[in-house]
Amino acid sequence: MKFIVKLFPEIMMKSKPVRMRFTKMLETNIRNVLKKVDESAKVQRQWDKIMVMVPDDRPDLIEAFGERLACIPGIAHVLQVNVSTFESVDDIYQQTLAVYKDQLAGKTFCVRVKRAGKHDFNSIEVERYVGGGLNQFTEAAGVRLKNPDMTVNLEIDNEQLYLVDKRIQGLGGFPMATQEDVLSLISGGFDSGVSSYQFIKRGSRTHYCFFNLGGDQHEIGVKQVAYHLWQKYGESHKVKFISVPFDPVVQEILERVDNGQMGVVLKRMMMRAAARVADKMGIQALVTGEAMGQVSSQTLTNLNVIDRCTEQLILRPLIAMDKQDIINISREIGTEDFAKSIPEYCGVISQKPTVKAVLSKVEAEEAKFSDDLIDRVIQDAVIIDIKEIATQMDTKITEAETVAAISADEVIIDVRAPEEEEKDPLEIEGIETKTIPFYKLATQFADLDKDKTYLLYCDRGVMSKLQALYLQEQGYSNVKVYRP
């Protein structure tokens, strides 16, 4: 049994030197991936295809090899074939009949032949001869050249006959590492997972930069998304996962920045930090999952203001995509379930975000920050080889307990920002309520009565859940989320 790996058409269109370089890289990538399945994998490069040989005594490898080949960038499709030699056109027919006789019963069919080498016949003659024989000596429902129930695919390569047993759709794109590296800003949601996948598929080693706003549980979830993408689509090359503790930045934004500017300022601070990380790694481009108009910070005006904070190239592969299309891709690539369980925190810090930020106003707000703020969070960043995440894959993302009813001995903590709380104060008769903004809760919770149970409240339930998880990570078990 062999697999014939067909190159993505854009590779075939390259100049001879570039095509050879891409093909060599694809051969290496295939070998690197399949060797992890079994050391017996043999890969052989030819001018227009790559052959993968499966040992005759290891039929158990066929399915595993096929699944891996389907996810390697640079492959148009893969043919799973039985290999033999032939002496004549009739011999080709006899071998085809032996394989397809039972499969054709009651079905319309056509025969398609691809041929390479010198022969005293052409492809059309083989199609007619084999098709006529199969039509006459099987119980097929007849020949149908357009939209048949079954297509009998044959490939003739000099003296070898390839009877195609299965056609596997490839990923397309370019072989990994034929394009330059990128740094993807990943949050674990639908958008950042799909945008990362798009650049893996296009041939870039995609490293991951995560801005941690939600404690260990949030980080574990995002790491699982990144590891899944790497293991399934980019395993042929090493990449890095960088975690940047960004809660000090968020706290300064909430305490010092005008509410309407918070979203744009946060994104600019993230871009600055990511650009610093990219510079250290020798990477020239950042990748984000932003789509035009999807949220307030992603208007063209705001994206323009965000881009002004760095000289790094910022790539947005999803910029004109609809949300449902993004979700559909996430389902296809296996990140949908991860994304459903990971909340997006960036959108909860501003209640009246501007959709037309003015650069001078944003820069004036940013002047309120500590000069060394970005330097400090970058210094505390943790960089790991993505393979190390495998040791954390069994860690489950825990959920903070959520309640709708309150007992008299429980205390509600309103964690909303002061202006939100003042606009719509939470008052429940007979229940003690405290007001502690979420960005101060971590430092003030230790001063509270440890014998009481505290229910955290915010309008959307996102920030309250985030803070409950963080407090639980610090060892506090007397905290829940209140969702009336």
Swiss-Prot record:
Q: Which residues constitute the catalytic centre?
A: C458
**What pathway does the UniProt record associate with this protein?**
Cofactor biosynthesis; thiamine diphosphate biosynthesis
Q: Which UniProt keywords apply?
A: ATP-binding, Cytoplasm, Disulfide bond, Nucleotide-binding, Redox-active center, RNA-binding, Thiamine biosynthesis, Transferase, tRNA-binding
Its name, as the record gives it, is tRNA sulfurtransferase
Give the highest taxon in the source lineage.
Bacteria
- Domain THUMP residues, every copy: 63-167
Which parts of the sequence bind ATP? L185, I186, K267, G289, Q298
Q: Name one GO molecular function term.
A: ATP binding
**One short Pfam family name for this protein?**
THUMP
Renumbered to this chain, the signal peptide range is none
Gene giving rise to this polypeptide: thiI
Give one GO biological process term.
thiazole biosynthetic process
What is this protein's function per UniProt?
Catalyzes the ATP-dependent transfer of a sulfur to tRNA to produce 4-thiouridine in position 8 of tRNAs, which functions as a near-UV photosensor. Also catalyzes the transfer of sulfur to the sulfur carrier protein ThiS, forming ThiS-thiocarboxylate. This is a step in the synthesis of thiazole, in the thiamine biosynthesis pathway. The sulfur is donated as persulfide by IscS.
Q: Where is the Rhodanese domain?
A: 406-484
UniProt-annotated location(s): Cytoplasm
Q: Name one GO cellular component term.
A: cytosol
